[in-house]
């Protein structure tokens, strides 16, 4: 479920009656359909910025300044958004609920995230995770607050082993399950070296994508602590 805020420093998240946000009825229908097929469902509310800025750049001063937007204002709106979908996740018996995705600058607001997770647990009885961005697994300070560690697995094809070594140390430290809540590679030349950069364009090459996925799966299958993947949807209209 993707909501939007107007700019990186906006403090209001537009999710009620927004034309780009799917309705609760649509979510319920799709969750029940997936479950009827025997699938387990992860509900993942996300925030995008309407002007195209990546959500990792949502940021405010650490110390409140008069007449400037504040973290407290942003989290008030974000919490309302997340708690609505936590309740929906409980009602539809989703297996995992994701409290946030790739909010790199917001990650440092440890107290706000811990408080939010505590409120989520009052509404939702399933597994709770946070989807940190690539390279942030060993930087996030509040993994103890969630049930499952998850991250975005957009690593260069020749770096998988060393990145898995780094992530493994985090998993061992916290003794929690781990999965890639996002992972993928676009099917264009050069995509295997910068799979996270959706702004790049190159000649279409499905073998680039195929070899990247083969590398990801062949390296992670040897790591029994990697419990699974949620694969990103690369849309054909990009070409």
Residue ranges of predicted features:
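Aromatic- and acid-rich polysaccharide-binding/catalytic face
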Residues: 82-101, 132-161, 176-177, 181-196
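Substrate-binding cleft and catalytic face of glycoside hydrolase catalytic domains
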Residues: 1-12, 25-106, 190, 234-237
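Aromatic/hydrophobic pocket-lining residues that form the small-molecule binding cavity
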Residues: 23-27, 78, 82, 113, ...
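Aromatic-lined carbohydrate-recognition surfaces of secreted/lumenal glycan-active proteins
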Residues: 42-47, 96-108, 114-138, 175-183, ...
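Aromatic-rich peripheral "rim/lid" segments of glycoside hydrolase catalytic domains that contact
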Residues: 11-17, 190-239
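A short acidic, glycine-rich active-site loop
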Residues: 16-25, 65-78, 199-211
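Acidic-and-aromatic substrate-binding clefts and catalytic sites of carbohydrate-active enzymes
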Residues: 6, 18-22, 75-79, 104-110, ...
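Surface-exposed amphipathic alpha-helices with a cationic face
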Residues: 28-40, 90, 113-125, 168-175
